[in-house]
């Protein structure tokens, strides 16, 4: 019997058995946060679908974000790779990534709910940046929680968050990365849920967050369906997106979930090896298992006691130990395929598309592009669309060190001397 594809959750779960095996999602949170989540549920089914909210969000998407973002035909890459390669360029949205779609929608919802302060976690800094920008535009206080390691490797985004007026909290507990920032943000929300709104950055967490984030990010695939008609009359053959928590992938895939002839491929962080702690692969690995963490049930990299494992990726946005519940479900029912790309492959893909297409994709998006290059070794004449979820400006402290270490070291030394 064909397995049912859940395009939205039912009773908070994606999957046939509510809360049991083969069902992901749910609402596993401390009792103190239940009133806040019930309030959010009410807003999701009320304000979120109201004409007034939708009209204001549509206007902000156009006049503040700069939507629609373009669909670009990669002429040179297409010739070299012998397939028609298209790029949905979310990096040209305000703040440089797809994260603004979700952050702006949630901050606007917070304003309609009469909240005064916004809390958010961030890994690569793009969600924090987008949330800070949305708060600046809509006039709400903003506090961002970010791992100490991520702050060090994403300093440009931290500077810009603070420029937008946000207070950035450095999280020094645990692995000092995204999973620890999420924990701290949840703790803070539990203290002040009465006047604060938690803007969750990916399509995960307790219900209704996975649905809210998917709905807001699905503007990507909604636009894409219209844009492809200008290029070709048929459907694309393959869609490829990187997967950290899953927000850009769900936004990119949503309007194609029922188009079964379109292959949907998610690309995880292959890091530097296959051992535990050397990557962030949650699918097709013996290191991941079903579990409950940070408010939801899904597939996690975790130890035998259920503690989230350390991960690695050159990309700060892909090193999360869990995966969104809807993507876990879509993998289980066979609708979304998963691959991985190593740090090395991502850097090579970044260099390839920079050289031949004049774009600098974010390291996250470069993982998707690495998978595109690999796919093209075995297929020809297909229409392949990759989601460029963000620009690579934010990654200069990583990419410059990795690609031109001596030049970068010389530049930094000279700059320090000038400042001194």
Swiss-Prot record:
Keyword Zinc-finger: no
Top-level taxonomic group: Bacteria
PROSITE patterns listed in its UniProt record: TRP_SYNTHASE_BETA
Modified residues (N6-(pyridoxal phosphate)lysine): 99
Reactions accelerated catalytically: (1S,2R)-1-C-(indol-3-yl)glycerol 3-phosphate + L-serine = D-glyceraldehyde 3-phosphate + L-tryptophan + H2O
Gene Ontology CC, one term: cytoplasm
Listed pathway(s): Amino-acid biosynthesis; L-tryptophan biosynthesis; L-tryptophan from chorismate: step 5/5
Family the entry assigns: Belongs to the TrpB family.
NCBIfam families for this protein: trpB
Listed name of the protein: Tryptophan synthase beta chain
Source organism of this protein record: Helicobacter hepaticus (strain ATCC 51449 / 3B1)
Lineage: Bacteria, Pseudomonadati, Campylobacterota, Epsilonproteobacteria, Campylobacterales
Gene name per UniProt: trpB
């Amino acid at each position: 019997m064909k397995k049912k594809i859940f395009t939205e959750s039912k009773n908070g779960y994606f999957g046939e058995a509510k809360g049991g095996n083969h069902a992901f999602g749910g609402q596993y949170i401390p009792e103190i946060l239940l009133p806040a989540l019930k309030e959010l549920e009410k807003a999701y089914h009320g304000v979120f679908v109201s004409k007034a909210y939708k009209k204001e969000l549509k206007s902000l998407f156009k006049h503040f974000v700069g939507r629609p973002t373009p669909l670009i035909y990669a002429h040179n890459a297409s010739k070299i790779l012998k397939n028609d390669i298209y790029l949905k360029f979310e990096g040209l949205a305000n703040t440089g990534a797809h994260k603004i779609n979700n952050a702006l929608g949630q901050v606007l919802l917070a304003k309609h709910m009469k909240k005064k302060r916004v809390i958010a976690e961030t890994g690569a800094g793009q969600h924090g940046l987008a949330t800070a920008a949305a708060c600046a535009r809509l006039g709400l206080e903003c506090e961002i929680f970010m791992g100490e390691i991520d702050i060090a490797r994403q300093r440009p985004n931290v500077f810009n968050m603070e420029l937008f007026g946000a207070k950035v909290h450095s999280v020094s507990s645990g692995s000092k990365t995204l999973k620890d920032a999420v924990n701290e943000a949840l703790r803070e929300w539990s203290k002040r849920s009465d006047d604060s709104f938690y803007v969750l950055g990916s399509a995960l967490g307790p219900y209704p967050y996975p649905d809210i984030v998917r709905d807001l990010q699905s503007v990507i695939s909604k636009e894409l369906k219209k844009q492809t008609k200008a290029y070709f009359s048929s459907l694309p053959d393959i869609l490829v997106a990187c997967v950290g928590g899953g927000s850009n992938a769900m936004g990119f895939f949503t309007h194609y979930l029922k188009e079964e002839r379109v292959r949907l491929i998610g690309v995880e962080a292959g890091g530097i090896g296959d051992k535990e702690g050397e990557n962030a692969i949650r699918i097709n690995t013996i290191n991941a298992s079903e579990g409950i963490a940070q408010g939801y049930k899904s597939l996690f990299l975790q130890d035998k006691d259920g503690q989230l494992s350390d991960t690695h990726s050159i990309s700060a946005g892909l090193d999360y130990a869990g995966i969104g519940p809807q993507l876990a479900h879509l993998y289980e029912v066979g609708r979304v395929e998963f691959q991985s790309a190593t740090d090395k492959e991502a850097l090579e893909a970044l260099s390839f598309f920079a050289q031949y297409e004049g774009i600098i994709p974010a390291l996250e998006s470069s993982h998707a592009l690495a998978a595109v290059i690999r796919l093209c070794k075995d297929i020809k004449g297909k229409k392949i669309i990759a989601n460029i979820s963000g620009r690579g400006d934010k990654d200069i402290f990583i990419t410059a060190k990795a690609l031109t270490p001596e030049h970068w070291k010389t530049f930094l030394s000279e700059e320090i001397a000038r400042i001194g």
